[in-house]
């Protein structure tokens, strides 16, 4: 998969993106044939036990990026730029983006609007593809005051639309639209020539992304409205561990077939 192929898919074939955080989930994603694997800073909420994405560090992204690349050697991988890996200085941000590329990413994702255009242009000029991210941007959760749908009011709608146009002009190859009204997502998708990938952004984006753990049901207490659970893996894993515990306690495991014998 290449950026040129993604661009050609706009308006013709829906783009499928999922998160993956380790080698096993990456292997599953690649075998399923998804178009893009995202090493999201959502690793903070879903794997590392943080309350938000804000504590996630470059070092943590890199460790999991390497694991995902080993599990999905043939996939197009986008890595999130975590909080404070950009925004302080363009030079530092470009260096961090380059580190992610060197460690296996095909592109990086940067949250925020036209404020970051100088950074995005700098990255692209030295060969680092960039995916944008507008609407609800999790790294700004303290400003938003929680998980809130964006683009309901005219001023918010205008800002997001203008930012989408600006991001296209400065060279991003696609834009994630998160938790924005369906009407706004449709308008943006129709007004820009690059693909939009929605998460809680309705039916009219050029593609969709969901968190792996939400898809397979590994987060029993977190079921956002915009997501869909396709399996209840949490229950399957829980029951397996309970069965293992029961077998050990009742001396039903291991059996003779699980043991090794001495001899020549």
From Swiss-Prot:
Cofactor binding comment, as recorded: Binds 1 Mg(2+) ion per subunit.
Cofactor: Mg(2+)
UniProt: 3-methyl-2-oxobutanoate binding residues: 41-42, 80, 109
Signal peptide annotation: none
Annotated CDD domains: KPHMT-like
Listed GO biological process terms: pantothenate biosynthetic process
Pathway connected to this protein: Cofactor biosynthesis; (R)-pantothenate biosynthesis; (R)-pantoate from 3-methyl-2-oxobutanoate: step 1/2
SUPFAM superfamilies associated with the record: Phosphoenolpyruvate/pyruvate domain (SSF51621)
Catalyses which reaction(s): 3-methyl-2-oxobutanoate + (6R)-5,10-methylene-5,6,7,8-tetrahydrofolate + H2O = 2-dehydropantoate + (6S)-5,6,7,8-tetrahydrofolate
Swiss-Prot/TrEMBL keywords: Cytoplasm, Magnesium, Metal-binding, Pantothenate biosynthesis, Transferase
Cysteine pairings via disulfide bonds: none
MF annotations from Gene Ontology: 3-methyl-2-oxobutanoate hydroxymethyltransferase activity; magnesium ion binding
Subcellular location: Cytoplasm
Catalytic site positions: 178
Pfam families in alphabetical order: Pantoate_transf
Residues where Mg(2+) binds: 41, 80, 111
EC number: 2.1.2.11
Class of the enzyme per the UniProt entry, highest EC level: transferase
Function: Catalyzes the reversible reaction in which hydroxymethyl group from 5,10-methylenetetrahydrofolate is transferred onto alpha-ketoisovalerate to form ketopantoate.
NCBIfam families: panB, PRK00311.1
Subunit record text: Homodecamer; pentamer of dimers.
Family of the protein in this entry: Belongs to the PanB family.
Descriptive protein name: 3-methyl-2-oxobutanoate hydroxymethyltransferase
Organism (species): Thermosipho melanesiensis (strain DSM 12029 / CIP 104789 / BI429)
Gene name as annotated: panB
């Amino acid at each position: 998969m290449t950026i040129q192929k993604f661009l050609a898919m706009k308006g013709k074939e829906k783009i499928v993106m999922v998160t993956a955080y380790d080698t096993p989930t990456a292997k599953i994603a690649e075998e399923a044939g998804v178009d893009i694997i995202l090493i999201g800073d959502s690793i903070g909420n879903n794997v590392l036990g943080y309350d938000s994405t804000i504590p996630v560090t470059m070092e943590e992204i890199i460790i999991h990026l390497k694991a995902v690349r080993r599990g999905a050697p043939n996939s197009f991988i986008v890595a999130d730029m975590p909080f404070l890996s950009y925004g302080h200085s363009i030079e530092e941000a470009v260096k961090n983006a380059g580190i992610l590329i060197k460690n296996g990413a095909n592109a990086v994702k940067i949250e925020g609007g036209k404020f970051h255009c100088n950074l995005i242009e700098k990255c692209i000029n030295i060969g680092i593809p960039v995916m944008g991210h507008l609407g609800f941007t999790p790294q700004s959760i303290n400003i938003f005051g929680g998980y809130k749908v964006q683009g309901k009011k005219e001023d918010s709608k205008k800002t997001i639309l203008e930012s989408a146009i600006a991001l296209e002009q400065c060279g991003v190859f696609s834009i994630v639209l998160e938790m924005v009204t369906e009407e706004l997502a449709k308008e943006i998708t129709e007004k820009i020539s690059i693909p939009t990938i929605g998460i809680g952004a309705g039916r009219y984006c050029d593609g969709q992304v969901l968190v792996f753990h939400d898809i397979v049901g590994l987060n029993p207490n977190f079921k956002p409205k915009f997501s869909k659970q396709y399996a209840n893996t949490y229950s399957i894993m829980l029951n397996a561990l309970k069965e293992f515990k029961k077998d050990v306690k009742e001396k039903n495991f291991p059996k003779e077939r699980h043991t090794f014998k001495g001899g020549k």
